[in-house]
């Protein structure tokens, strides 16, 4: 495998022109889009317009004149088309944590006689914290049951009310079989909430086709919505009017500007809204999503797998002396869009990589994690990144005090 071969891959890449849509610092190979996507070039202009023209000149009339009030539904629809959702089944709102709390709280109320919430030890800890917090509020015998990721489909029993599952493991990149787990859960009357934080924008998701009923996700990773961008939630049309919102805010009221003293939930997905939307952040996301208008997600998936295979092969060719252990060891259909390696000095190596312009991230206790984001990554990027990884490990340039000092964010 040589640079000529790599160059040919890039020349034949059907997605290569999309790289131009992003602000990518010179000399940086950005392999952390699974944590924070880069800035789409179209976003600053939209933010300037919203701030200077809409807020600055139109003031409060912008809620009508510039359709601020419909942003949660409009942005939700754009996301919905990317995750295989039915029309009017997704809204953009709040954070993933808040949306998980909303759907989880509403779901356990649908099956009050069941007291178990199921999740797995590979789930993102934040989701487990939300579950634990809700259980403290519920009391009355509720429990969180944790199992190994590979055991989920085998432990679905009729005392379980809800299962909370992140489709792609944030550390290893393992991808659960949404269709299989959802079908088996339904056989036992279990509601499943799918966390799509590492799925949306990474590969084609088919919520409707898989039979999924409930989902949440963020927009600042593969969707490139920006730091702290608003999240989204999905409820299948069949369940929408059964959901009783635990956070009954005015944006979820059937007529918010009637100012009724009593809460009456809106019909459909809108009842899951709560407070006033963050217009500036949601407008940025709205524009960021336009990057995907002419993108075939199946091509994204195909390139992602090729990037993975190239990365894995190049690391393997370095030999065992690197002490890097591949953690994403699953078949293609069971992988997300990242590649992870374990190394005893993973944190220091990652800091040295970042210092050399190869930006990935570290996840405790020893995981070097690299996001594979086909819209702006080239095959040459992967080739060069592995060259730098090899140099850092072979020269032990990672073994400097500055690379061992832990930052607040890893």
Model regions: which residues?
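Pyridoxal 5′-phosphate
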Residues: 1-410
